[in-house]
């Protein structure tokens, strides 16, 4: 029966409609369990990377820490590099969210990009130097997952939008490609961060000079 009334022992009783709710609940529970397992694997992998680095990280150890079979790791992440790519995108999203609350003028590239660098350095402190450098190193590695382009990352989107705003304000040439300029800026920044000494005044000064040089090169004369 799908509705209406039933006659039970001479009494008219509304029948209970048959619905798909139980099946939906089962699917919802399974999806929640899948996401919880994935999160455990992700957290265990990041912790292992912090101890051993990407190259030295043991997938079996990651799986054991997460309490899953080795194959479960590969079910959620095809390679160890995929974990770092996801971590990078999550960190970039945090940085962009923080930058969206900025007080600097939208076309003030120097202030915006300097602030961006400060947030990236804060991310380095959160993640630790080993994970941070491995994450940045993927941008220059042949093992970077196919299809993960820097220009499609949240941070790149923010930088490109900032350059485009400066173009609209007449501070950067409209003939320049904002997308290309954004990728050039971030590629250079990541290279400096991946190869330079960590947590030093000299590096902070170098990064400030880098931002100034890039912005001056973009600006209209």
Where are these regions (language model features)?
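Hydrophobic/aromatic-rich alpha-helical bundle segments in the mid-to-C-terminal region
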Residues: 130-136, 149, 168-212
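An amphipathic alpha-helix adjacent to DNA-recognition modules
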Residues: 35-43, 55-56, 67, 76-100, ...
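Hydrophobic alpha-helical bundle segments that form small-molecule/ligand-binding pockets
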Residues: 104, 152-181, 196, 218-221
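Hydrophobic alpha-helical connector segments
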Residues: 86, 97-127, 178, 182-185
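An amphipathic alpha-helix signature
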Residues: 42, 114, 118, 156, ...
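Short secondary-structure transition hinges
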Residues: 121-160, 194
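Basic, helix-initiating cap at the start of DNA-binding domains
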Residues: 1-52, 56-65, 82
